[in-house]
Amino acid sequence: MTEVLFKYHGNLTGRAHFPTLATEADTTSDKYSNLYMYVGLFLSLLAILLILLFTMLLRLKHVISPITESTESVPQFTDVEMQSRIPTP
């Protein structure tokens, strides 16, 4: 019984499948549509990675040398220098 089902219903190798007009018509835009998609995907991922890299580098730069307001009239002191200048009663 199952052999009869496979012979007539399950096996599609005996049937001829002719290509439709959509698969036969191969224009230039169809040839390169996948290429354009992959190039666009690659460029967008590259742009995202570059943006992340630059933001991480800027954060690291601010951690290493924090931004201070550049006022030349006000001297900058470290904590050790400030503790030695505090008057003691």
Swiss-Prot record:
One of its GO terms (cellular component) is membrane. It is found in: Membrane. Glycans are attached at residue 11. It comes from the Eukaryota. Keywords: Glycoprotein, Membrane, Transmembrane, Transmembrane helix. It holds the Pfam family SRTM1. It is a single-pass membrane protein. Its main location: membrane. The chain crosses the membrane at residues 38-58. This is Serine-rich and transmembrane domain-containing 2. It comes from Mus musculus. The gene is SERTM2.
